[in-house]
Amino acid sequence: MRLTQGAFSFLPDLTDEQIVKQIQYAISKNWALNVEWTDDPHPRNAYWDLWGLPLFGIKDPAAVMFEINACRKAKPACYVKVNAFDNSRGVESCCLSFIVQRPTSNEPGFQLIRSEVDSRNIRYTIQSYASTRPEGERY
């Protein structure tokens, strides 16, 4: 099952040329960029690990692509995404986020977990099959 987080997640994976165009768009808006990675595929996982430092005042997409490729090389079995932030109002609000790499192996999908709670109510949650393995060994 394909993880869907951020823009373009229902489309085929972006090529490097398409990624550069999105980075150029973010640069044209004076947005700060950063690269993040994770091996925890839960759809509500908002706490990805930051790769390097945020890229403020970048004028050339090559600098961002360098960081993306370094992260891809170091973390080939992880998800990698790019975030663009607008700090024009003094608040770092995410304006654009998209996945630039998925694990090299198949994404195993999610299991539905049912829990009976008070008054016979049922609560549902999902858990990735990949998260049953320890961090760093999921893909």
UniProtKB/Swiss-Prot annotation:
InterPro entries: RuBisCO_ssu, RuBisCO_ssu_dom, RuBisCO_ssu_sf. One of its GO terms (molecular function) is ribulose-bisphosphate carboxylase activity. One of its GO terms (biological process) is reductive pentose-phosphate cycle. GO terms for cellular component: chloroplast. RuBisCO catalyzes two reactions: the carboxylation of D-ribulose 1,5-bisphosphate, the primary event in carbon dioxide fixation, as well as the oxidative fragmentation of the pentose substrate in the photorespiration process. Both reactions occur simultaneously and in competition at the same active site. Although the small subunit is not catalytic it is essential for maximal activity. Heterohexadecamer of 8 large and 8 small subunits. In this alga, in contrast to plants, the small subunit is encoded in the chloroplast. This is Ribulose bisphosphate carboxylase small subunit. It comes from Guillardia theta.
